[in-house]
């Protein structure tokens, strides 16, 4: 009774883990037999209690966790805040996705952790609780889906779906949640069907490669060992893995703590000894593994260690190879049957947080941290070393140490509340998570114009690419605007920066335009379909538009006008000017240049004598097809073009032009295809084809006719000649000639067809063979050159009534020589004739000594209409601005008397109108196809006004100057202080000025543009002809980027030399919800377009955040459409790590065929090592050391990679099983060609130990290199051909063995099973064994510490010591590398 009183009574619920510990203790204390007796009693007790209680499971037993409601609500609130931050441009899409997933993952995890305590408190005998937590059926994850929430799912590609399933199976799923959860179910069904066979085949191959490994000895006598240490310089090995690694192993060396020996060599390690090592903090423990065993075809007891079935050393005769193969293959088979509903993306859990213990103020050393962004886009401080953070409250000071590489989420001197997160500790580096680099494409939500800051590289990543790198965090902005198709605009009179009344954003456009050429008359047809059946209010009638387009009295000019300060212009931006023409009725007999005049002003604005001032191309002389130009007997003299001619439309400069002397030339059309040499041509030479015949795989013919194929250097030229084929008689003399033109009216007198030729024809003789020939009659297009143009129709009279000292001469050029072929590039048309206006001036003039003339603009204001004229004079002038033009307020058809060259209208009422319903300013671009494209901006749909700001006060001097100075008064009346500043569009800020003189000063380089200071030193001419003298105060310098005022008058120079900062600057960007006025935050993000005295107008813009390393698609100022790729983010994500995706990885590693499994770094190092060590040590030593080094490194890498996959699934496989497999696939070497030996052939595979022993026996060096065999190749390269033949390729293996006369010694298990004999394992392992030499007993063992890290920590230098080099093995210096993958 006394003894019983001392017994401790435990009244606790016992779970699976506690039972395991109890059994382990019982075995240690009482042994196996007594323990089994105790466990029988426990089992009987359990059955009796289960029968008595009769537990059943019903749907009411599934109790939802009460805290679920507010946890989900809290997660939704965080997601809403995150969505707002993303909308404001504070976080980008990847950060948003990452944080959203972590928010819901953390919520799901909290619910899962709440589940067990909730059951324990509310209903400890709940059947669901008892079943799931006893391990009888179901696990915590499955029960969590029943009573918690299903959480996040992965799609079939393994990517995370952003939408979590908030319901559990007890509450029921919505339709959306059901469809999302079906992804996981389908994946599970497919995995069960498909992957199980893969896992089974993997098991078969694994068993095949190691079936002959049996424990044959107690001790092989090795002195090598592998060092395992719990802690290193870089990383900690977790304690459970350290214990699992050591338990059951045998020590390779004595262990000393101080001077006391606590464990001996060849002693097996139990849990007690391992715990003692951990307690005493032993630095490194040297253990024996299958890698260190000195045999190839068997293994000794000490190198294998304890048997997993009973806690003692493995018995002799144990078939440990088959056990190893089954241990690795079987978990894969089991795990494929398990369905993974959650996708298992976050296998490692969330990061650890440091929380404040109570309220107080934070203090830390700011020099030890630097600002950064967390992976969720939050601002934080990163500390590189241990950082001490002090929390001061009223009565206590608490210090917290933050480990290195952690994020500090609070600022210095910030007040924190109790339990507030102050730091985030990075996850432990020892994780088994798969990381993969993923590209995330961000697409544009709306159409508009791209804008970025100087933080993006303006030069693209590669030449001719449109990808730009982001070196630091910055915003991309899409400035809103509605695109207008060029088909509708191209016949209207609207140009860049015009105001428009047509509502392009309201209706869809459908327009068909066609040009028909009838003789000399050019008629234009414009067909406009009904734009919309329902006419909405505010949409004007389209008769006004048709009036503009149909009665096209005016001609469009697409001129490239370059200014003196051309560095301010974007290369792709061109300003458009308008030149009026008389109506068609007035010039019925006149030449009407429909395609428009292009005025070519040189870059510097200087014309030389006889230089081309303008040119235009008549569409009548334009051909779509290729062909040959013929003048007949017409002579032509070539005119060399001036070198300073501007390139027109990006076409290369013409070397020569041909001036026509008579008025007719001919064009003979033909279809030409130039094909690469390797093309497959599907038609024969000199064959006749129809229209739309397939010529090659991708090309069909446009015309029918005769095929002619010419093979030239590296290309094939295929021509199709349309026309008639004639076989001439002897009487047809005219057809015996080749290459002649026949005028109309000449018939064929003696042929069957007596019809005369209606048009010109071209006769060409074709000779397929020497004897045969025929004649091809081809149609000819005849062109007449029109008379010279009346210059009065092009340019009005001299309005300034100056002396006419500059003449314009009309010259027609033919752009191709006689007989030269014309070739069209893709679908472009070919211009045959160009009419040019050549500048010349009177030689009798006094200024004739001047060899150059300058072009400049003159602007005159009358009745609110500003008229711009271009003057070409022999005086020096400047071209230094681009004019802002808008339509008049009553914009419709502009009457002829208002049409002056280069008109421009004061935007006095234009800006106010532009914000009404259907007004807008258009901007002109060249799109990706180099076509003109318009963007509608400054309309009510994409702009908004902020203000008025009542609290804005201007300086008194400005107010006084406004009173005194009429100039600023006019400017105030004209509406805005400024308009938008884009790339190269610098507008005049004072719209009613005639600019006689203007100086441009380079002020500051910003954003790849020049900031401009405009010094306004000019006179104002009003419509009454009065000239307002400028006031001293009017020397105002305007900085368009900041709208600050400078006064240059001497009285104010000392007071106002500095900038006076204002609240809002022009062109500035505002994010949404930003406070810029006292009234509160404004609601939209945008760019400041107009600044007025009391309000601002913003153009809507959408911000996108880009972090370093992102790639921006598209160029600055380019139009983007909805759905275009905007940014590519490259980031690392955790791959879904279930075993079905891990198994192929295990197979890749074991079959040594994965591409990325040898890191290039290691491969280069090993190659370098082999190369240089051979030079240092000589041929034999270098090869042996290099091979041993490579084998050791690859073995360690392979073990780590395989363990990563299984540990990520929570599957524990002992390292020794993997080591046995890996030892077999790394035990062979490849005989190399250097130093030919008489024993082995180059390229032969032999075992490493065999190579060493043969070298010692023959006393000559055998050169070899390490090689990694896959498990399949290793199975086919064994000592037994019977085993190989029974695996695969039976006929080949047996035939080869017969030819070579191989002998099978029947050492393995499989060959004995095949032949029906007893297997050499278990009790029969002693039968028929060939005893190996006992050479190892003579070796003097030198005990040294060998350090080789098998696991994730650093590997150190290894020294293998032997007495002599050729006696046993080589003493090698092995440098090991970390973080490599082997293939």
Swiss-Prot record:
State the Gene Ontology BP annotations: DNA-templated transcription
Q: What is its EC number?
A: 2.7.7.6
Assembly information from the UniProt record: In plastids the minimal PEP RNA polymerase catalytic core is composed of four subunits: alpha, beta, beta', and beta''. When a (nuclear-encoded) sigma factor is associated with the core the holoenzyme is formed, which can initiate transcription.
Q: State the name under which the record lists this protein.
A: DNA-directed RNA polymerase subunit beta''
The alphabetical list of record keywords is: Chloroplast, DNA-directed RNA polymerase, Metal-binding, Nucleotidyltransferase, Plastid, Transcription, Transferase, Zinc
Predominant location: plastid
By its UniProt entry, which InterPro entries does this protein fall under? DNA-dir_RpoC2_beta_pp, RNA_pol_beta''_euk, RNA_pol_Rpb1_3_sf, RNA_pol_Rpb1_4, RNA_pol_Rpb1_5, Rpb1_funnel_sf
Q: Which family does it belong to?
A: Belongs to the RNA polymerase beta' chain family. RpoC2 subfamily.
Keyword Transcription recorded: yes
Record-level GO cellular component terms: chloroplast; DNA-directed RNA polymerase complex; mitochondrion
Q: How is the cofactor bound?
A: Binds 1 Zn(2+) ion per subunit.
The UniProt record gives the binding positions of Zn(2+) as 220, 293, 300, 303
Which cysteine residues pair off into disulfide bonds?
Answer: none
| Catalytic activity annotation | RNA(n) + a ribonucleoside 5'-triphosphate = RNA(n+1) + diphosphate
The residue ranges crossing the membrane are none
Q: Which domain of life is it from?
A: Eukaryota
List required co-factors: Zn(2+)
Q: Which organism is it from?
A: Aethionema grandiflorum
**Is Cell division among this UniProt entry's keywords?**
no
> Where, subcellularly, is it found?
Plastid, Chloroplast
Question: What phylogenetic lineage does the species belong to?
Answer: Eukaryota, Viridiplantae, Streptophyta, Embryophyta, Tracheophyta
Protein role: DNA-dependent RNA polymerase catalyzes the transcription of DNA into RNA using the four ribonucleoside triphosphates as substrates.
Q: Which GO terms describe its molecular function?
A: DNA binding; DNA-directed RNA polymerase activity; zinc ion binding
């Amino acid at each position: 009774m006394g003894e019983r009183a001392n017994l401790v009574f435990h009244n606790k619920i016992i779970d699976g883990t506690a039972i395991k510990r109890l059994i382990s203790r019982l075995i240690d204390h009482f042994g196996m037999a007594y323990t089994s007796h105790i466990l029988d009693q426990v089992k009987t007790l359990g059955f009796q209690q289960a029968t008595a209680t009769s537990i059943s499971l019903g749907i009411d037993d599934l109790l939802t966790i009460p805290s679920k409601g507010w946890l989900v609500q809290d997660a939704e609130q965080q997601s809403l805040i995150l969505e707002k931050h993303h909308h404001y441009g504070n976080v980008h899409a990847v950060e948003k996705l990452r944080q959203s997933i972590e928010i819901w993952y953390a919520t799901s995890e909290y619910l899962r952790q709440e589940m067990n305590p909730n059951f324990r408190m509310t209903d400890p005998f709940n059947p669901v609780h008892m079943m799931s937590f006893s391990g009888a059926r179901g696990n915590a994850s499955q029960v969590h889906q029943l009573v918690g929430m299903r959480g996040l799912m992965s799609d079939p590609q393994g990517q995370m779906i952003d939408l979590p399933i908030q319901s559990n199976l007890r509450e029921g799923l919505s339709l959306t949640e059901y469809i999302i959860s079906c992804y996981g179910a389908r994946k599970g069904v497919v995995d069960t069907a498909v992957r199980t066979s893969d896992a089974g085949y993997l098991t078969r191959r694994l068993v095949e490669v190691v079936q002959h490994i049996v424990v044959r000895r107690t001790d092989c006598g090795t002195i090598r060992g592998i060092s395992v240490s719990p802690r290193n310089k870089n990383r900690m090995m977790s304690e459970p893995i350290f214990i699992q690694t050591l338990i059951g192993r045998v020590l390779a060396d004595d262990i000393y703590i101080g001077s006391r020996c606590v464990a001996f060599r060849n002693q097996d390690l139990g849990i007690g000894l391992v715990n003692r090592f951990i307690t005493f903090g032993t630095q490194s423990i040297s253990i024996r593994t299958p890698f260190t065993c000195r045999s190839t075809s068997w293994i000794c007891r000490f190198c294998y260690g304890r048997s997993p079935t009973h806690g003692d050393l493995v018995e002799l005769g144990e078939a440990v190879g088959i056990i190893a193969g089954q241990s690795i293959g079987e978990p894969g088979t089991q795990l494929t049957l398990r369905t993974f509903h959650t996708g298992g993306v976050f296998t490692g859990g969330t990061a650890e947080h440091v929380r404040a213990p109570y309220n107080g103020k934070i203090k830390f050393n700011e020099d030890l941290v630097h600002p950064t962004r967390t992976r969720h886009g939050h601002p934080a401080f990163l500390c590189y070393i241990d950082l001490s953070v002090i929390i001061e409250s009223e009565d206590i000071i608490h210090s917290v140490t933050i480990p290195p590489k952690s994020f500090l989420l609070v600022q210095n001197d910030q007040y924190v509340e109790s339990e507030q997160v102050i730091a985030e500790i990075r996850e432990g580096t020892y994780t088994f998570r798969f990381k993969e680099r993923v590209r995330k494409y961000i697409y544009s939500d709306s159409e508009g114009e791209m804008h970025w800051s100087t933080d993006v590289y303006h030069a693209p990543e590669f030449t001719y690419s449109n990808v730009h790198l982001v070196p630091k965090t910055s915003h991309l902005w899409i400035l809103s605007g509605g695109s207008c198709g060029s088909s509708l605009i191209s016949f209207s009179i609207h140009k860049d920066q015009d105001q428009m009344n047509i509502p392009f954003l309201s209706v869809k456009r459908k327009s068909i335009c066609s040009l028909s050429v009838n003789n000399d008359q050019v008629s234009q047809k414009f067909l406009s379909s009904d734009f919309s059946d329902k006419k909405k209010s505010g949409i004007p009638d389209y008769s006004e538009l048709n009036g503009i387009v149909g009665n096209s009295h005016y001609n469009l000019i697409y001129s490239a006008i370059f200014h003196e300060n051309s560095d301010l212009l974007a290369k792709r931006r061109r300003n458009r000017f308008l030149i009026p023409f008389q109506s068609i009725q007035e010039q019925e007999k006149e030449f009407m240049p429909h395609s428009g005049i292009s005025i070519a002003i040189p870059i510097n604005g200087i014309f030389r004598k006889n230089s081309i001032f303008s040119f235009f191309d008549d569409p009548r002389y334009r051909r779509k097809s290729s062909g040959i130009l013929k003048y007949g007997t017409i002579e032509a003299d070539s005119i060399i073009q001036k070198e300073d001619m501007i390139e027109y439309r990006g076409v290369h400069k013409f070397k020569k032009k041909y001036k026509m002397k008579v008025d007719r030339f001919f064009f003979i059309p033909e279809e030409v295809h130039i094909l690469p040499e390797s093309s497959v041509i599907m038609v024969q030479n000199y064959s006749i084809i129809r229209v739309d015949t397939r010529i090659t795989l991708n090309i069909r013919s446009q015309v029918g006719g005769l095929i002619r194929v010419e093979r030239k250097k590296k290309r094939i030229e295929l021509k199709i000649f349309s026309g008639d084929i004639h076989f001439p008689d002897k009487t047809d003399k005219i057809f015996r000639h080749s290459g002649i033109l026949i005028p109309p009216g000449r018939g064929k007198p003696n042929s069957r067809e007596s019809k005369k030729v209606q048009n010109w024809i071209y006769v060409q003789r074709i000779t397929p063979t020497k004897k045969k020939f025929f004649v091809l009659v081809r149609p000819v297009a005849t062109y007449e050159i029109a008379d010279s143009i009346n210059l009065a129709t092009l340019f009005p009279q001299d309005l300034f009534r100056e002396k006419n000292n500059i003449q314009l001469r009309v010259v027609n050029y033919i752009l191709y020589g006689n007989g030269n072929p014309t070739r069209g590039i893709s679908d472009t048309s070919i211009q045959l004739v160009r009419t040019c206006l050549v500048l010349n001036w009177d030689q009798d003039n006094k200024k004739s000594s001047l060899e150059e003339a300058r072009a400049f603009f003159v602007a005159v204001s009358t009745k609110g209409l500003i008229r711009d004229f271009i003057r070409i004079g022999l005086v020096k002038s400047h071209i230094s601005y681009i004019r802002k033009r808008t339509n008049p307020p009553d914009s419709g058809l502009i009457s002829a008397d208002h049409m002056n060259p280069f008109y421009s209208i004061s935007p006095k009422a234009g800006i106010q109108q532009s914000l009404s319903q259907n007004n807008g300013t258009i901007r002109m671009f060249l799109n990706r196809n180099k076509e003109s494209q318009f963007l509608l901006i400054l309309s009510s749909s994409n702009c908004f006004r902020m203000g008025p700001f009542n609290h804005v006060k201007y300086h008194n001097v400005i107010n006084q100057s406004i009173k005194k100075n009429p100039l600023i008064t006019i400017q105030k009346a004209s509406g805005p202080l400024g308009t938008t500043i884009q790339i190269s569009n610098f507008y005049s800020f004072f719209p009613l000025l005639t600019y006689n003189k203007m100086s441009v000063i380079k002020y500051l380089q910003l954003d790849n543009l020049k900031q401009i200071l405009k010094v306004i030193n000019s006179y104002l001419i009003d419509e009454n002809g009065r000239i307002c003298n400028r006031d001293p105060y009017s020397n105002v310098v305007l900085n368009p980027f900041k709208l600050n005022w400078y006064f240059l008058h001497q009285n104010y120079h000392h007071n106002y030399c500095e900038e006076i900062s204002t609240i809002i600057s022009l062109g500035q960007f505002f994010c949404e919800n930003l406070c810029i006025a006292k009234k509160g935050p404004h609601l939209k993000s945008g760019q400041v377009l107009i600044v007025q005295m009391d309000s601002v107008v913003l153009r809507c813009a959408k911000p996108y955040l880009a972090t370093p390393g992102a790639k921006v698609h598209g160029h600055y100022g380019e139009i983007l459409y909805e759905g275009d790729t905007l940014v590519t983010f490259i980031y690392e994500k955790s791959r879904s790590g279930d075993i079905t995706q891990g198994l192929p990885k295990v197979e890749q590693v074991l079959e040594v065929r994965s591409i990325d499994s040898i890191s290039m770094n290691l491969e280069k190092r090993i190659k370098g090592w082999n190369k240089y060590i051979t030079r240092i040590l000589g041929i034999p030593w270098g090869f042996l050391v290099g091979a041993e080094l490579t084998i050791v490194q690859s073995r360690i890498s392979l073990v780590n990679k395989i363990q990563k996959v299984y540990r990520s699934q929570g599957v524990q496989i002992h390292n020794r099983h993997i080591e046995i497999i890996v030892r077999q696939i790394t035990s062979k070497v490849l005989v190399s060609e250097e130093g030919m030996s008489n024993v082995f052939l180059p390229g032969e595979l032999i075992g490493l130990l065999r190579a060493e022993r043969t070298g010692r026996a023959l006393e000559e060096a055998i050169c070899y290199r390490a090689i990694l065999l896959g498990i399949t190749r290793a199975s086919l390269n064994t000592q037994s051909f019977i085993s190989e033949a029974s695996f695969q390729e039976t006929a080949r293996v047996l035939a080869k063995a017969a030819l070579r006369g191989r002998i099978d010694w029947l050492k393995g298990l499989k060959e004995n099973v095949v032949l029906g004999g007893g297997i050499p394992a278990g009790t029969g392992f002693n039968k028929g064994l060939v005893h190996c030499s006992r050479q190892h007993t003579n070796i003097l063992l030198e005990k040294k510490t060998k350090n080789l890290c098998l696991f994730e920590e650093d590997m150190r230098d290894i020294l293998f010591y032997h007495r002599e080099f050729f006696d046993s093995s080589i003493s090698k210096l092995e440098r090991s590398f970390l973080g490599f993958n082997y293939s």
